[in-house]
Amino acid sequence: MYLPNFLDGFDRLVAFDAETTGKRAPDADFVRRQPFAWRAPGIIIEVGFIEMLRDGEGWRKGEIWSSRVNPDGPIDPEAIKIHGIRPADLKNAPRFPTILPRVKDFVGESPIVAHAYKNERDFLDYEFARAKVIPWGESAYAEERYICTQVLFAQLFPGAIKSLTSMCDRLVLDSSERDDRHGALLDADMTADALILLERQLKHGESGAPRSWTST
């Protein structure tokens, strides 16, 4: 459970989201059972990061960064329907090992804000291991580094649908851009906006949206 002051000790957060091939990250046991010549296919095809900087009692957005990623593998057609990213769009995109130093530099020592954080954590762990930066089965970032807006939203709004779009609708955040397709930077941006409002709700019991948006 998140306490009202759980972010008070931080001056910088990083909101993160990834778009993927639609495949789940296999567990370490599966990977270890594969033949020596087996090459782990990539999963992440786009990353989006939003820097959040302390601004008085709240937060402001700082640097943003996103990149597409060539997974060297197929993309599930159902995933393409969601994010609209096709293999041809990634032909000249960097591989994950190429952007990995930038990922590590951007995150630094800051907490990572994500919606349904276990998915994003698993994707990062897989790609870090695939790049031979960490062993299979280990984590790129400790679990306590993650702040999950889905968990916080469920804490404040028990029983509500917890998807990113539903959360934004409940918080009166415009999520209409997601109607056509998802994107890593867009989703990271909405996750950052949601955290700002959810923290305010947790601390003060306030609606995050201006009164004129919520009055009937």
Annotate each predicted stretch with a short phrase.
Residues 2, 32-38:
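Short, P/G- and charge-enriched loop/turn segments at secondary-structure junctions
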Residues 4-12, 26, 40-85, 104-216:
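Metal-dependent phosphoesterase core characteristic of DEDDh/y 3'-5' exonuclease domains
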Residues 15:
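Walker B beta-strand of ABC/ABC-like P-loop ATPase nucleotide-binding domains
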Residues 18-28, 35:
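Short acidic, Gly/Ser-rich segments with clustered Asp/Glu that frequently serve as metal-coordination loops
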Residues 80-100:
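Metal-dependent phosphoesterase signature
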